[in-house]
Amino acid sequence: NKAEVRGIFVGKTISYHRIDVEKMRGLFIANDFAPFIVLNRADALSAQIFSFIHELAHFFRKSESISNSIDFRDSNKNVNAEERFCNRVAAELLLPEVELREEFYDKNGIERIAEIYKMSNIFVFYRLKDIGKIHHGQAGNLESQILKETEENILDRQKKRNKGGNFYNNMRDSNGNLFNKIVANSYLQSRIGYVEASSLLKFSVEKI
């Protein structure tokens, strides 16, 4: 809501047009008049939060972005400097280094932190690895194990997810509050007609 108050449009992908998280987790379109952040509805909530902050960092740096891949949170990954910077901004805000007091963390420690901060195990692992809190000799095995569990969890969520849902609620969520409000106000002020407003919203303007 605070981002939208600042004039940043925040929406999500459409539920009936699924985009794999491996292809896109978050998207930022830089525009001085109407900047857009789009999150992938298919992603886990904790991952959407990370993606939102990551894309918000792009907003302040005025750099467009498409974030993807299962391990894009790894700040040491072979990606460009801009992406690494935005990853680190999001990581520090969500899991401050000052709170991570142990010298090294094992899998139990990773899971404990993930539970406390309501973040995914893979995010916590990469955060700890980035600041040198994962023992070098254990990093490879831990990464493989947690990545495997992460992929299995994603598949489980996909099987359990209700692919239908409430169409109007899903579309409101996809459009974002700011977009819905602007279209509805324009209709109520007679600046656009009923057909145009409903076409923009992808549902009847009366449903707002």
Kindly give the residue locations of the regions a language model identified.
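Active-site hotspot residues in diverse enzymes, especially metal/ion-binding acidic/histidine motifs
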Residues: 1-208
